[in-house]
């Protein structure tokens, strides 16, 4: 999707523009000022190299004072770190607790105690991600996904037309033979079989979703294509044998 164009149209129409960047943040160049989004959220367990159970969100400063948090907790309040709330500077409510929110997006943070294990893991993942040249990463991954596309077409797969990112590709059954044989259920069986061979992909919306990373090599890609070719060949041959048996019967 052309996020920059969408952002421009949202601005013209005074529409709040929210982007789920989980599939791209950390490996694809994405600038909130360029796309003019108001909210950019991402789970850290994919391209941000973090653990499951943590997410990050950017919120445009224009909403910091007017948006109220979903979670009402002490860490979003002024002077929450003080030993006693009576030492807080600001509005103390009738219950004896400060009611003023802290400045900035921190007022919108989720509740609960800070996780002393997961948050340092998130920080380390972000440190590594910051060192990655996103442009160079896309060029390298585009080489891999272009080869996956070319090899997939030789087997009978194709991709949706239009521009695409370099780090994800979806191979769809394209030939009439594969379209008739590779039902969604059978595609899941193929994915499970490939997993046993150390080849990992996912079935999403009628396509094999393949997402190489920076440690993926061209040899890995060739192994993927060979394994996929063998699996599809086995299905085609099995179907031919079954048809022959029916004809003989």
Protein language model annotation of sequence segments:
Residues 1-39:
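Catalytic PLP-binding core of fold-type I/II PLP enzymes
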